[in-house]
Amino acid sequence: MTLVAGLGNIGKEYENTRHNVGFMLIDTMLKDGGFNSVSSGKFQGELFKKGSLLLLKPSTFMNLSGNSLKAVNDFYKPDNIIVIHDDLDLPFGTVRFKRGGSSGGHNGIKSIDNLIGNDYDRVRIGIGRGNNSVISYVLGEFIDDEKDRLKDVLAHCKNAVLELISCGDITQISSKFTLKA
């Protein structure tokens, strides 16, 4: 079983923000259909299941994402976990893959690492660094030029995640799917 968790913040006001690219990728994957919604209360998030694939959108707000992942991990005990999140240190449109490592200052990743460790794969989607404060920038919406490109980036990431689920080799996926801005 594989758990794919997209990080973001709940609520309409955050729906199209840079910090929610993880949620956006889960929504892109859900469009393929065939997923059943699983009771969300005990998992502190929206959980969807299709065969041996679980998709998760934590409802804990970004900085407490680990609570939701831990609940799902403890119940389902997936063989593999893939976390999708925004990355300020990568230019917009860049996509990188890694296993484990440091949180890079991302509080959602810190929360996950603190509760389940860091032995999981990560899909890092670059959002760049704006001129505003970090909080204003990550909670801001994409500009029009970025919105058009974002659709392609999300489609690219979806293909990478599906292949990662199939092959299980983050190094192979990184070689094939790393995207530069």
Swiss-Prot record:
Native organism is: Campylobacter fetus subsp. fetus (strain 82-40)
According to its UniProt record, where is this protein mainly located? cytoplasm
Membership in a protein family: Belongs to the PTH family.
Write down the NCBIfam families for this protein, in alphabetical order. pth
Give the reaction(s) catalysed.
an N-acyl-L-alpha-aminoacyl-tRNA + H2O = an N-acyl-L-amino acid + a tRNA + H(+)
Which InterPro entries does the UniProt record give?
Pept_tRNA_hydro, Pept_tRNA_hydro_CS, Pept_tRNA_hydro_sf
Name listed for the protein in its UniProt record? Peptidyl-tRNA hydrolase
Q: Site Discriminates between blocked and unblocked aminoacyl-tRNA: give positions.
A: N9
Residues that, per the record, bind tRNA: Y14, F61, N63, N107
